[in-house]
Amino acid sequence: MLPLNKLILIVILFFNYTYLVSAEDLISIKSGGKAIHWTSEKYPFITKNIIDDIEETYWVSSGNTLPHVLTFSLPSNKRFEFLSFIAKNNNKPETWAKHIRISSADPFPHMGGWEVIADLYLSQTGEEKIIAIDPKRGRYFRLEIFSTQNEMAKEASFSQFKVMDLLNN
């Protein structure tokens, strides 16, 4: 039998996970998100694949001159408190993004108003990484890829990026 405190923790984690899974992805194409700038892409593995909510699609760079910078926009300034990243895709694992940074801006990303939200290293498995942050507002998001799982990779790849807010449900 589980101690009461562990049982309570399991129940809380289950409900939070269930609620997060049902949270709307604010940056997805279905929600009006757009890919607005990128340093490179290799057709058909284009930048918008990262926000299309289809795990089988992904982005691949044309070459591996780092950093790769991918910029996305929401239809309007929105509140968010969770970010999700998936590097794993059908491309070679050594190409999967390793060191990334995500920044947000509103209203003028071209005027240097970027605020770094997260600077992190993704695991070699490429599995989904969800991070919770203090609630913020933003309209533009910049994903920078500084390294791949193997520094000798000839290209970089990334699967999915999500921006979520539990209060919007």
Spans of features found by a protein language model:
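Bacterial N-terminal signal peptides that target proteins for export
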Residues: M1-I8
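Extracellular carbohydrate recognition and processing domains
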Residues: G112-D134
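Disordered, acidic Ser/Thr/Pro-rich linker "stalks" and the adjacent N-terminal cap
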Residues: V21-P75, K88-T95, P135, E151, ...
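A short beta-strand element within beta-rich, extracytoplasmic domains
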Residues: R79-N91, L143
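Short, surface-exposed beta-strand/strand-loop-strand elements in extracellular ectodomains
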Residues: P93-F108
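Noncatalytic modules at the cell exterior or secretory-pathway interfaces
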Residues: D134-I145
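Bacterial N-terminal signal peptides
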Residues: I8-N16
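Short beta-strand-plus-loop segments that form exposed binding edges in beta-rich domains
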Residues: E144-M152
